[in-house]
UniProtKB/Swiss-Prot annotation:
Listed InterPro entries: Globin, Globin-like_sf, Globin/Proto, Hemoglobin_a-typ, Hemoglobin_oxygen_transport, Hemoglobin_zeta
Organism: Pan troglodytes
Name of the encoding gene: HBZ1
Protein name: Hemoglobin subunit zeta
N-acetylserine modification, residue list: 2
Family: Belongs to the globin family.
Length: 142
């Protein structure tokens, strides 16, 4: 599945706004993930998962930075996220379904933070983009 030129333009355009709030968006997305899907906490037994904790903020920042890497390499997302895919598949052994859960939580966060920008067209583009990201992150599982 690949993005159309229009979808790519939407992603890159919105990213300019998102990147200015990356840390906050990452933290909020993880808080939403852990609240909505508490089973995902099992991958972070060594983290303080209280809302706003330093570890949660740091990991949220990493998550959004990885999304940013995918945006910057929108024509080669696989290349941009290959090492991250290996890490999650071989070392962390994260269940692939969690990427979809995280993607959904990011979509909700973006919709809440950017209601004027998050039109139906933008929602569809971000959903497709995050599906591509999730697919790339699960490539090494096969």
């Amino acid at each position: 599945m690949s993005l159309t030129k229009t979808e790519g333009t939407i992603i890159v355009s919105m990213w300019a706004k998102i990147s200015t709030q990356a840390d906050t968006i990452g933290t909020e997305t993880l808080e939403r993930l852990f609240l909505s899907h508490p089973q995902t906490k099992t991958y972070f037994p060594h983290f303080d998962l209280h809302p706003g904790s330093a570890q949660l903020r740091a990991h949220g920042s990493k998550v959004v930075a990885a999304v940013g890497d995918a945006v910057k390499s929108i024509d080669n997302i696989g290349g941009a996220l290959s090492k991250l895919s290996e890490l999650h598949a071989y070392i962390l052994r994260v269940d692939p379904v969690n990427f979809k859960l995280l993607s959904h939580c990011l979509l909700v966060t973006l919709a809440a933070r950017f209601p004027a920008d998050f039109t139906a067209e933008a929602h569809a583009a971000w959903d497709k983009f995050l599906s591509v990201v999730s697919s790339v992150l699960t490539e090494k599982y096969r």
